[in-house]
Amino acid sequence: MSTENKIAIVTGATSGIGFEVAKRLGQDGFTVVLNGIEDAEGAKKAAELQAEDISAEYVGFDVTNEDAVNSNIQAIGEKYSKIDVLVNNAGGLGGRQRFEEMTTDFYRKVMALNLDSTFFASRAAIPYLKKGDHPTIINYTSNAGWNAGGPGAGIYGTSKAGVHAITRALAKDLAEYNIRVNAVSPGTIDTPFHAQIKSTKPEVFASWKNNIMLGRLGQPQEVANVVSFLASADASFITAETIQIGGGQALGI
């Protein structure tokens, strides 16, 4: 499958794993549309890719804002006449609150960041994915979606379990259009977020690392490698699956 003239959208792509995914897909030959909410950084990252002869642009919008998602993904789809790959990378912990003290606003914020965003972007992209070449959606869940998260991260785990479920539901719903839908589940990856945990809560970080069977943190490029595979023709018979990328961490938690 040639990736010439193929279009990939990567949400939350201005740093960390998202940027490495956008870079790898660009190296694979995709035109990549980077999304984020920090416009100056987004423009800078798109320029970095362009300097490496990657066809890239930045489109800023908040993935938790339904109207913004609809209008911007529609604009991207109309500009390129299709979408081939949607990577729902945007998401995050959002903070920590135990259920007894949890505010409704916090609950809604975390669910919106992880689950609503996946739904909004996927729904908006479907009409253009139908026009794509071997189209696919790639979502992001987490070990927390399997083990319900650590202290204060229960609603994060709940939201990521929802992403796991919506991945399968979308795969079932879109199979008739040959749109594949899968998810990746990164473990503890060497990103600024985990570097912050290491410096502020070293005991928590140590417990995470001790549960990684391969004895080291994953690298963002290793997640990007799997996303690249799922976006390729080599994965043409894979749908409704979640791939763990955690060095065996899911077995240790």
Q: Where are the regions a protein language model picked out?
A:
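Conserved glycine-rich cofactor-binding loop
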Residues: 14-15, 38
